[in-house]
């Protein structure tokens, strides 16, 4: 049985999509079968994995709103074992369309259910909001990774996200756990980055991943080429960081 992991933080530009793309690619490189669900209308995870959004005929939108078979929405990528269900700009209005649907918070859970038997990991890239699509993702997920960027206001909004997780856990998804807090955009030369690292570790202790995602030029460049950093430059710090993160997650889940 596979594991569904949502990557969520309502604060934008924290490295959420970058982590989704490169963690997925790293897990697949380590011979895990991985499915990415792009649940962000911006569709950056889709383009970052080489999907031409204009050519997508069936996306996560059709699965959630029109009850399309998710298998019709699965696209392969350049990495063996890594597939993706693309997003679409129509997802912007999906939350309004879902308001009158029965069990509207559990639609994604029903959509993804059959896929747990076909993949080792399903990663959901959430939009930077706590709207109905993100609530669906957290209701469907077994756990959540919370990226925290090592910059000013890093912990801004975290308490609101944690409260949302607590509510979802109590009312919709009792098995939801925090997979871990992931420090991103870390630059050890900066005093601020080290201060934030210390603060996050003090607050969340063993929930913080040992792996830290460092600032890296190759990591920033890879999405514009539509490939994960491990294909763009396998020797880069960004590629090595995400491989280490993938191995840490595999090890945690094998215990």
Regions found by a protein language model. Name each.
Residues 1-255:
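P-loop NTP-binding core
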